[in-house]
Amino acid sequence: MSIRPNNYCALLCRDPRRLRLINSHPIVVDLVRRCLEESGLKFEFYQNSNVTCAFKFSKHLFRRRGLTSEEDGIKIRNALANIVAEMSKINWEVDFSTDIGRHLTNSCIFFTQNLNPKEDASGNVFTFAPSGTSKALLINVPDGIENQIVDGIKKVIKISDPEKLDTKASRIEMSSFAWYSTGDSAISIR
């Protein structure tokens, strides 16, 4: 399949406070806006041209160690997961993504439209995300799957018991590990 302007779009985290939509199809703009509104995050929508628009947040959400609160981190991660799930329902699939939320890396989620869907997209999207130096957030993970993930991590490294947060999230803390660590053991943990 060749990529044409009418069957791709991208969400770009270019700025710590801005999510830009490239090749902004009206149905996709409405979907992204709805998912962000449902997240409870405050943002302004603006359109630069017929093919690009942006959502500017009131807080820095895409910067390492720049979140104003863990709750905001959960909200934006949950919103992005919902965007992926909702896009899938209208036959837009993640083609690839880069490291989301790293300061000044132009993180991106690139979507292509599946013009010949073979299966119905169904099910929820959940998130496993680094948080702080040595913590991880499990967002919207069904209990059975969360237990499997936690058990799998425990086989590799010592961790705290999952702490349930006010939202649909749990936090675990890893002992003697930092996300920025290098080397073979750090890679195996990731």
Question: What would you call each of these model-derived segments?
Answer:
Residues 90-96:
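Low-complexity, intrinsically disordered activation/interaction regions
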